[in-house]
């Protein structure tokens, strides 16, 4: 990679190298603009569900969106970006009693339901989110978090063959991610408890596993979902091919 001698703060990520999100975020120049040249134009559709599949679109997306966690460029350890957390766990053999006010989305009856008594989980992670404004000026809030969990559960569960919330690529992936989620309990306007059946000797890895976040406003995800359910587009490339519709892109 070639870097102008007047550019400082280039980060050589041990995994991603110089083109990681840390370089454009950390770089300093004598100008107000930072010019970055790429070899090819992006190839993946511009949607955060099953688009952004190539290196170049991922590099752009990594600059203009925030994850809830990320990996340290030199150590590979998980660190917080959009939330602080506190992990409670006693290992694989001991369980935590989940409070009955905790909820989970039920895709069969299409509503949030409280968990039953005597519900247990391996770990509890309390997330204190760092909300700010979306690019359109709207303030982030708990609706974005809850809708993200709804979306993952709804699309990760195929009720029957006529289920419209099914994608050939995304549904199997979402189904795997929801297997260990037990419940979510909203504490206040920016704090939730997430209960999971997962353990790791590093508590930050438990937090990353339990993390619930949305890179876009919930309204945007809902609009994309409606377009897909109406049969106009598909979240994934294979879904678009099988249904003979366009691969959903928010900018084309």
Name every feature range the model reports, one short phrase each.
Residues 1-252:
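The feature preferentially marks the first beta-strand/turn patch immediately downstream
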């Amino acid at each position: 990679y070639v870097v102008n001698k007047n550019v400082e703060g280039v980060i050589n990520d041990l995994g991603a190298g110089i083109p990681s999100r840390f370089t454009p975020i950390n770089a300093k120049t004598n100008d107000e603009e930072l010019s970055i040249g790429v070899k090819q134009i992006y190839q993946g559709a511009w949607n955060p569900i099953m688009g952004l599949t190539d290196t170049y679109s991922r590099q752009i997306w990594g600059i203009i969106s925030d994850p809830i966690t990320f990996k340290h460029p030199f150590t590979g350890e998980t660190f917080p970006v959009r939330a602080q957390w506190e992990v409670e766990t006693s290992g694989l053999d001991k369980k935590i009693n989940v409070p009955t006010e905790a909820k989970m989305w039920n895709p069969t009856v299409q509503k949030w339901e409280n968990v039953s008594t005597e519900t247990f989980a391996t770990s509890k992670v309390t997330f204190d989110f760092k909300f700010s404004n979306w690019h359109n000026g709207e303030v982030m809030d708990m609706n974005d978090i809850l809708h993200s969990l709804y979306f993952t559960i709804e699309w990760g569960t195929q009720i029957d063959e006529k289920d419209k919330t099914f994608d050939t690529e995304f549904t199997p992936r979402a189904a795997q991610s929801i297997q260990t989620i037990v419940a979510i309990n909203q504490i206040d306007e920016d704090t939730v408890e997430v209960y999971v059946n997962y353990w790791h000797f590093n508590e930050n890895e438990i937090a990353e596993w339990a993390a619930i976040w949305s890179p876009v406003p919930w309204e945007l995800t809902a609009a994309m979902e409606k377009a897909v359910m109406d049969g106009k587009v598909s979240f994934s490339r294979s879904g678009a091919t099988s249904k003979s519709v366009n691969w959903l892109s928010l900018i084309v």
